[in-house]
Amino acid sequence: KSDRLMKVLFKDVKKAKAFVDGPDLMKSLYNVAQDFQSLPELGLSMTDIFTKEELFHIWTGSNASWLRQSGIVPGSTPMYLQKKAVRDTMESIADRVIREGKPSATLRFSHDSSVLPLAYLIGLKETQGLPASSMYAGRNDPANVYKYVSIDKIIPMAGNIQLVFYRKEGSDDILVKFLLNENETSIPVKTDCAPYYHWKDVKRFWEGHPAIAQ
């Protein structure tokens, strides 16, 4: 709620409310305060205008909103499917490089709003686990959603996803390891060599073969 903040910012809250929407102002100031964290050289902070409870409340709502907009919350529009073309491109490039048999590195730059749904579409564990009931939790009780998925762990500043491929000389078996923000992670695919996965199994999982999933 924005009542406390409005009283801090305005001498006459009643008059201010005629021109200012309290919740919208609170959210906008929160976004500015968050952006300041990306510019430590300025030495500025706005988080002190909020209480810890307010910061947590706004963050849980923002977390749920990001997940719902990406389609990760069960029952929401599956917007993450828009990133299927990106995942398919990653797969085709990997297959081409494997065929060519030469060491290679491919980079793709994007925004956090694209990295989040792509991480879900790949199957990274940090994006999984929201129960079906979370659709209602995300809409009416967003405080619950972060207990399952937290965007801070997926798309911090400079967030990134890496697929690292390995092949033993003379072998056709390609292994792949997944990294999220430089940390090893996993996908719901059976493997006998964790944290590595057989590339053929990963592709089958992406194609929707349920038998290969854990």
Spans of features found by a protein language model:
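Signature for phosphate-centric chemistry
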Residues: 1-214
